Structures are given as structure tokens and as C-alpha cells.
Amino acid sequence: MKILQLGKFYPVLGGVEKVMFDLTVGLSETGLSEEGFSEVGLSEVGLSEVGLSEVGLSKEGLSEAGLSEEGVECDMMCAGSDGRGTEVIRLNPHGRILCHRTLIEAAKTTIAPSMVTRLRRIAKDYDIIHIHHPDPMAAMALRLSGYKGKVVLHWHSDILSQKALLRFYLPIQNWLIKRADTIVGTTPVYLAESPYLQGVQEKCRCIPIGIEPVISDSAREQEIRNEYSGRRIIFSLGRLVEYKGYRYLIEAAKYLDDSFMILIGGGGPLRESLQREIDELGVGSRVKLLGKVPQEDLASYYGACELFCMSSVMKTEAFGIVQIEAMSAGRPVVATKIPESGVSWVNEDGVSGINVAPRDSKAIAKAILTITDNEATWKKFSAGAAKRFAENFTKEKMISKCLNIYAETLSLH
């Protein structure tokens, strides 16, 4: 089976690109002894009677599934970021990145014409093209490619902030939804609530985002704890932008005592205004803006905190990968119940943490106090967070679910 992941960017800049990259690497590394099709997926393509190991296909079933003995070949086609030119990057024997020079980048959209010409040339080589939305350049390239094979549309989010762009893009988006054989979303909530997917629910499937667990450096973790004199650390991480709702997390500090320390990692355009808010509220002893946290320190901040807080207020926050990073470290989560967003599905209320109404600083503080009130309660939520991660959000589970959906898609006529 040969797959093409189609989208943006490389090098990876954000969550959508990270999912596409991780799928490319994970799928191209899939062999017979690793994650493969489940029995459900195999039966969809008529393979229930061939030899089947517990986690993959036997050699006898390969030809019927259209697979080589080596497993899955998976390439990733994208526009380049950071001035990257057109090049082919070999990831492993079965995976490549086909990177194309970006001529123009505006409104979070790239113009990379060489994607169109290359895709027209090579599209026929792939059994499935897995396109990641929103990305007008990728959609245009697919539209002009003449590709006749199966299409999986990965619906990461609706286009929410670029309204002018959407007016021009909507005809292509509508074509893409109709053209797709299968539509994938990261949560069942977002799939069910998106106004653009209401007429195609029968071909929607869910693949939650999966990641490698974060592993804290114990020495660095202790340094962070010592830096704040053993106070109870509440950690949050993300760009300092309006939809993250950080001012409500800052306001929540008014309802906490000095045994707590809220650390907010990340940079962005609202840094100065958020710092003014901290100063005006008089909570500087309980809230600190860390700025951009070095990648090598992130896991240790998760390890040093008692819980993670996601205060986002808009549907722009569709999933919240930082939540599952915290869960992988066994840290409970306080998140918000954003209408039509999957955030509160990711954080299972009462199990991995507590979900509260958006824009409610008192509710955020109350949830923090509830989880940290006593050791037994914290341990219950900590265990629940670790269990929810292991059962739903590992990279292995994401790859396995994706393979099953490919099998189902290939069986469609």
C-alpha cells in the first residue's frame, strides 16, 4: 500500500503539520511485526479468511490487501517553511518528504506552484492520498492533479479566522468534501458539530491525535520546583493569543492563595497586555509569564506541575495537544467546555480532570482547588489522566486506527 500525506509545512510549524509528519514516519515504519490492520479492518477488505497474526497481516494475505512484504510506503508532500527550497528528504527506506518552495505566504496560506506540477506527475503512484485540511494550496493541487484513486480528508478544523479567504476557498472546500471517500476528524465532537460536514456524517471517522509520552528529566524537574520554593505549580502552555483565554487563568489567581504558582509558557502578541493584567490585579507573586520554553525543558515543566490548565475560549482550539502531553506525564487537566470543540472530549470530566465553562475564572480556580485539595483526590485524577492517555492518545494507537481506516477506504467501490 502506498500513501501520500498532502498538506503543509516542513519543517513542522504547528499541530496539523506535526500530525501529518508523525503519520508519515509512523506509517512508513510499519512492518509485519509492528502495528497493522485489526481484524475489523481486515474483514472490511475481505481478508478475514487469510492468515492473521495478532497485530498484523500474514504474508499469505498481503497480495489480497495490495501490500508488499515490506508493509506501507508513505510520503509527505508539502510546502516549505523558513525559506526551505524544493527538495526530497529521505526519512527511511519507505518514507520521503517531498518539500516545495513557497513563493508567497499570506493569511496562513502558502502558494507553492511546484506542488501542482509534481502531484500531476506522481499522483497515479498512490493508492490513497490523505489530505490535511485546512490547506487551500494542498486542496488546489489535488483538484488539478487528475487523481482518480481513493482520498482520505483529515478535517483538523473549520476555517474560522480567515473569513475573506473562506469566501474564495468555499467552492474548492465543497468539492473536497464531496470528493473524499472518507473524512477523518480528531474528535467525534468536532466531526458531529462542524456545519460543513452535516451532510456527510456517514463517511466520517475519528482518529484521535497520538503522541509519544513526555519523559521528564528528574534533575531539571527538581530545579524547577526549587525555583518556586516548593509551591504547587499550575502549568499552561501555548501562544499568547486571544483564543487561549489566558486572562481568565490570570484572574483565577485572585481566588488562590500563595501556595500556588501559575506558570504560563509561550510567546505571542498579547504578552505585554497580559503582563499589565497581572500587575493591575496584583497577582504577580502567583502568576509568571515564562516566555518561550526551551524544547528540552518542556517535559520537566509537565513533571514539575501538579496539574495542567487549558483556559481556551474559542472553537479555534479544536483538540489541545498540550492536554494529552500533560496526561502522558500523569498530570490532571483543567480545561474548558468550548461549544463545538473537542477539547472537553479529550479531557474526560471527572476522570482525567475537570472541565469548566469558558471565560469563568472562579470556576477555573474552583477546579484547581478541587483536584489539589487532598492527596487521594489528586492521585485519582493523576491515574485517570495516565490511563486515558494510554487508552486513547498514543502514537501507536493513532497509526493503527489510520491503517484500519485505509483498509476500509480501499474496500469502498
Predicted regions and their residues:
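Short alpha-helical donor nucleotide-sugar binding micro-motif in glycosyltransferases
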Residues: 123, 177, 292-293, 300-305
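Short His-centered aromatic/hydrophobic patch
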Residues: 131-138
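Short hydrophobic beta-strand element within catalytic cores of glycosyltransferases
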Residues: 332-337
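Donor nucleotide-sugar binding/catalytic pocket of nucleotide-sugar-dependent glycosyltransferases
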Residues: 78, 173-219
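Acidic donor-binding loop of glycosyltransferase active sites
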Residues: 303-318, 331
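Conserved donor-binding/catalytic core segment of Leloir-type glycosyltransferases
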Residues: 4, 223-254
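N-terminal strand-loop element at the rim of the active site
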Residues: 5-13, 17-42, 47, 52, ...
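Nucleotide-activated donor-binding/catalytic signature segment of Leloir-type glycosyltransferases, i.e.
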Residues: 273-293
